[in-house]
Amino acid sequence: MARCERLRGAALRDVVGRAQGVLFDCNGVLWNGERAVPGAPELLERLAQAGKATLFVSNNSRRARPELALRFARLGFGGLRSEQLFSSALCAARLLRQRLLGPPDTQGAVFVLGGEGLRAELRAAGLRLAGDPSEDPGAAPRVRAVLVGYDEHFSFAKLSEACAHLRDPDCLLVATDRDPWHPLSDGSRTPGTGSLAAAVETASGRQALVVGKPSPYMFECITEHFSVDPGRTLMVGDRLETDILFGHRCGMTTVLTLTGVSSLEEAQAYLAAGQHDLVPHYYVESIADLMEGLED
């Protein structure tokens, strides 16, 4: 049972030593805004030198994989391959490719509530997008899925169009994630994809299929490409309701870092309430603290 224990000393060396790999969330864990968390790039280098696999799981649907890789490089995280990066946009593209692609005469289009990064990921998967300028308006395919991602230009008109498509019972409703809000550098919050997905669900009377954390579908996407033993893998994140719950659902050892969204007090409140799937096994002040576990 997870008890939210401080990870240090002999326990730290044991937990990190036994781990074959580590899954990291990104924002609030590796960086905040445009600044890397102190010691984070060095930790990833040390993990690689120790032969520990590192993979990265983000609910951010704003960036396609190549753009996300550039962000890693810009913030000082070198030596990573784009194949190590898994976003909710990438996972949504995988799911829709599985569900929609078939013979040319049966392929449908995706109506997207989201930005260009999400659209780029879908195009890279060979999917057709409703309203895409490259499509012939006279030969536009039927919309067979509505995808809700992070959309800075969400509007009543877009909501209405999404609901019109969803009146077709065979039209899928997919959301990249349910994060309700995201923190800004000034301490304020901006609505997240979860807020937009809730609006579409309420207006359409439909329930979205969610691909990002805490859905195990994201772990399924990872295991398609990497051999991961969840019993010997750490899930390190900053949000209890997504990262830590995801880790528990997938059978990993969970570590909360206190450089992001969730606080130690929130974790302890979940522990007191018996909501153990939202309680990390361990916590650290920063992921830089994990380097002690790699020392000889």
Swiss-Prot record:
Protein name in UniProt: Chronophin
One example GO MF annotation: protein serine/threonine phosphatase activity
Alphabetically ordered keywords of this record: Cell membrane, Cell projection, Cytoplasm, Cytoskeleton, Hydrolase, Magnesium, Membrane, Metal-binding, Pyridoxal phosphate
Role description: Functions as a pyridoxal phosphate (PLP) phosphatase, which also catalyzes the dephosphorylation of pyridoxine 5'-phosphate (PNP) and pyridoxamine 5'-phosphate (PMP), with order of substrate preference PLP > PNP > PMP and therefore plays a role in vitamin B6 metabolism. Also functions as a protein serine phosphatase that specifically dephosphorylates 'Ser-3' in proteins of the actin-depolymerizing factor (ADF)/cofilin family like CFL1 and DSTN. Thereby, regulates cofilin-dependent actin cytoskeleton reorganization, being required for normal progress through mitosis and normal cytokinesis.
Gene: PDXP
Keyword Nucleotide-binding assigned: no
Family assignment from sequence similarity: Belongs to the HAD-like hydrolase superfamily.
Tissue specificity: Detected in brain (at protein level).
Biological process per Gene Ontology, one example term: protein dephosphorylation
Xref: PANTHER family: 4-NITROPHENYLPHOSPHATASE-RELATED (PTHR19288), CHRONOPHIN (PTHR19288:SF94)
Highest rank taxon of the organism: Eukaryota
Subunit structure as annotated in this protein's UniProt entry: Homodimer.
Annotated active site: D25, N27
Gene3D superfamilies: HAD superfamily/HAD-like
Enzyme Commission identifier(s): 3.1.3.16, 3.1.3.74
